[in-house]
């Protein structure tokens, strides 16, 4: 089957966790998957350990470090050359969370790294692909059946960035708050590390980046009719035992899944979360 007969979904961050567990249900649904990761080697090794040999034939690996905007531009050029006109879905899943940092890490362009990866990289990726995404044919073939399909963008979300949710009001270290965006307005380069221009708080930097994701989805919904593009910010439930939390204290990694399973009842397995992402 040539690319002209295939329909592609792009997903970032598939070396572990929710992203890795989204691959199989996507392939089962008839999709070809463009897996975007910082390391193709890690992504391939993870996929080999998770998928059948037959399923692996439907994965197309593209190496992009989302923290480097130049790499995003180069990677998108490759994606458009190889799969342009056949991309139907973008799933922004990759994220970094380093709540124990004392000082901000910086991206290649000098931006605070969690904002660079979680928001800037994905924002640029979407913007460079959106014209191709929304101009594609609405009739696609999945599992040898022709179906009408509306292109879509899905960004993985979190309740900790939503002040309307209890999890978004917990003041540890502080709720998400972009203020008047003075940090962005003033260039967001050292010594600036927060969107609101205030003192660096690593946990809040993550929340702020995810709030920016939510705003991006809302803006896409304003700019494109639902017949042209469906945009979603998706919270799958609390997947409390993924590598997203690898930089938290060990006691947190031990207790947090138990708390979500038996107290809040919000716990969701990586497999179920992946299936939910594939459905959207």
Features from the language model and the residues they span:
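Rossmann-fold NAD(P)H-dependent dehydrogenase/reductase core
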Residues: 2-240
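A glycine/serine/threonine-rich, flexible loop-to-helix segment
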Residues: 169-171, 240-261
